[in-house]
Amino acid sequence: MSGTRILVTGGAGYIGSHTVRLLREQGYDVWIYDNLSVGHAEAVAGRQLIVGDLADRTTLHAAFEQQQFAAVVHFAGVASVGESMREPLIYYRQNVANTLALLEVMARHQVRKLVVSSSCTIYGIPTETPILETSVPNPVSPYGRSKLIIEWMLEDCAAAWGLGFVALRYFNAAGAQRDGTLGEDHTPESHLIPLALQVAAGQRPHLDLFGTDYPTPDGSCIRDYVHVEDLARAHLAALEHIQPGEKLFCNLATGRGWSVKEVVRLCEQVTGLGIRTIEQPRRPGDPPHLVAAVNTARTVLGWEPRYVDLREIIETAWHWHRTHPRGYSHS
């Protein structure tokens, strides 16, 4: 599909920018639609960047009218379980309503191929491990519910007007581009690995451990971490697989779980620096254990994670952090 024109919403964000780079390397003509509220123009070198919000249907329609996109990769949205518990309406507006706006414009312009960012949070507190795509969704946070509503919308659009889609259910994205030119830069930061690395680098006084009484071997939550470059490769595979009217749901993970305390110890080993931690109460909406089966991505998309050692994932994140201690704009 070299030369195919693609729209990537939220393409200046963490996972989006890594995917944009890979798609461009593969010959796709990539246009980015991003309001830059959390994304960074520097991450995409400002190339073919439309600064706009999905809620602005006029700007969105004009982009489709002018560029004649063949497919869309949809990253735009907000993604914090904790914040969604405090501000649920933000999540229904930014995730659900804005995806609705995108789908309306896609339908109007007869664009029937979509790869969308979903989330492991749709599963809630799983009743089986590893989690399969057929596991019953039961989200426990507004963020997870917003992602499940989006999946329902996609299924209805597939039935009504032939939308073809792949919904990629990420587990915990981590790491950075191996060459250190792209990485994680959130304000405020909420992800475990960059927070731990900031403590190691002396940029934060301590790391909060939210919940140490979970039913896990060391009492801390267990998560399945997947490298951001592997996520980008999965989006490429999904884009090349998708056909109008077809639907696919895929977990993206490594299939191995790591506890919060294990992650902190690995960060200390990678950096050679101590990380002070303070135990805090559990956060609402945090399941104790999330580990995935990735058989669907493997058998249907031909995707395998290349980064299966969490230490190696953390090493790429540390390389980014050392070369960009204050992110893109202030390194």
Regions found by a protein language model. Give the residues of each.
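Short, flexible, glycine-rich and Lys/Arg-enriched loop motifs at helix boundaries
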Residues: 41, 171-192, 202-223
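C-terminal substrate-binding subdomain of Rossmann-fold SDR/epimerase-dehydratase oxidoreductases
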Residues: 195-331
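Short capping/connector residues at structural and topological boundaries
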Residues: 41, 49, 86, 90, ...
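N-terminal Rossmann-like NAD(P)+-binding domain of SDR-like oxidoreductases, especially those catalyzing
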Residues: 1-176
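Glycosyltransferase donor-binding loop in the core domain
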Residues: 55, 76-79, 91, 188, ...
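Short-chain dehydrogenase/reductase
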Residues: 92, 140-148, 182, 186-194, ...
